[in-house]
Each structure stands twice: as structure tokens, then as C-alpha cells.
Amino acid sequence: MVFAGTPLFAIPALETLVKAGYDIQAVLTQPDRPAGRGRKLTPSPVKTRALALGIPVHTPENGAGAEVVVRALNPDVVVVVAYGLLLPPTLLAIPAHGCLNIHASLLPRWRGAAPIARAIEAGDAETGVTIMRLDAGLDTGPMLARAAVAIGPYETTEALTERLAHLGAQTLMPVLEALCAGRSITAVAQPSTGAMYARKLRKEEGAIDWRRDASALERQIRAFTPWPGTRATIAGVAVKIGAARVVDAPHAPAPGTVLTVEPDLVIAAGHQALAVTLLQAANARMQPARAFLQAHPLKAGERVE
């Protein structure tokens, strides 16, 4: 077996495979990238974990490089979890059991790079994981298993990602066990309707627009935690909003107007209002809104951006 993955989301699957005794010949992951304020070359989370587990690691720059590695190893199966590279059809044809992928949505909804954040942003009641066999398309391959979970009312992308990472590992195992035992697995083609694309998150999406409904803003905050964050200017200070809840505001003034500062910082939105509970200024830790307001006083009737 060859394992291909890059972020933290892929680690539970890798660890589960190791614990189950599968022979992982090698791990493919993205090359080291500059990270942090010093822009120091940093290995991916999967690379760090694989090396700690004693598994050989390869970091090809593209799909062609990945194919060279897989062709040399000729594995029975390749398990792909948030690898970050499109694999060419010639690579997909090498393993006898194909290339199996853990995708963090209930396909065909939310194909693409950011399925977890987009599900929260859209207000989906549930999401889940799909085990599919990769084909030449983008998350279009036949489905071998699915598992659904409800999205919690206060759940962020960070928290839901951790939950789905473990669910994906659990859902993968029966599929692999059946393949290794020679049992047939029904591969179900994805429906032709209901497909949606989860485009990659962009930093500029984090800017808050107080003219939107408060419910949409609350989902934006949860969807964009931890990245890119939801940004605003409050009391003249650029901040990242860490948490908020929707509150009624039957006679609210213009969007962006501060309604109250005690007991909560409540700001009018296009419909209803947002009670901001956690804030983070630049070079500071996330803190309760009350603590922020002690250092940066604000009055009802003032405007924020």
C-alpha cells in the first residue's frame, strides 16, 4: 500500500492503517513549504508523522512525479486523503484495487478543496465522509461507502475537521478489509444531480459585511475558523471575530451600528444582530469581547466596519 496525504486531516487514517497492520510501503505528501513569520521551510503534518512511524516519505512536486514513485512500488492499493495533487489517469490504473479516497463531504455535494467550510457556510444540517475510487475527474469517482453526521450549531471548521478525520478513517477500514479478502464491493456512481463545488478558501472572503443577515455572518465566523478568519474593525482596531451568536433586533438601526456593549457587544446586521463573544486583535490572543472593550471602549450608537 501507498498512502498519499498532507494535512492534519489525513493523520487519523494513516495511524489507523498502521495500527491495523497494513504494509505501507511509502507515504506521498506535499513538499516542505515556507510557513510562519520566518517563512521557514516546514514539512507537512503527514510527513512529520510518517517519519516518526518509520515510513519512507516521498515529496514529488507534481502528479507525474507521484506516478514515478507509485509505478516503482507497484502497490495493491493507494489510499489518498487530502493529498493536494491531482493524480494522472496513468497512475490511477497502476494499483490492482485502484486509488481510494476519503473525501470530507457526502458526495456529490461539495466536491473540491474546501468541503467542510462550505458546508458550514451554507448552513447544511449534515455532512459526512465518502470513500470513493478516484477517476480522472475532480471528486467524481464511484462511491464505495458513506457516513453522515449532523453539524453542531456551534461547530467550527476546525472542530468538524477533526471529527470527520476520525470518521473517515473508521469508514475506510471495512472497505479495505473487503478488498483484501477478495469480497466484492458495490461501487455506486455519483448522482447526476446535487453536485456542488467547494471552491478553495480565499483570504479576502474573511472580511465581514454587516449588511448581510446575522445568521449568515455567524456561519461565516464558524466556517472560516481557523482560516482565513472573519475580520472587522471595532473601536478602530482591526480584529478577528472568534465567536458570535445571533440575537433578535426588531428595531435595529443601520447595519454595523453598536446596539449594546453590556452585557454583550451586540452589533446590528442586515437582518437581526450579532452578539460578538470572542475577539482577537493583531499580535494578541483571542479574548472575551468584554475584556477587549475594557481596553478599547465603545458606546451604543457607534459604528463598526
Which role fits each region the language model picked out?
Residues 211-305:
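An anion-binding loop in the catalytic cleft
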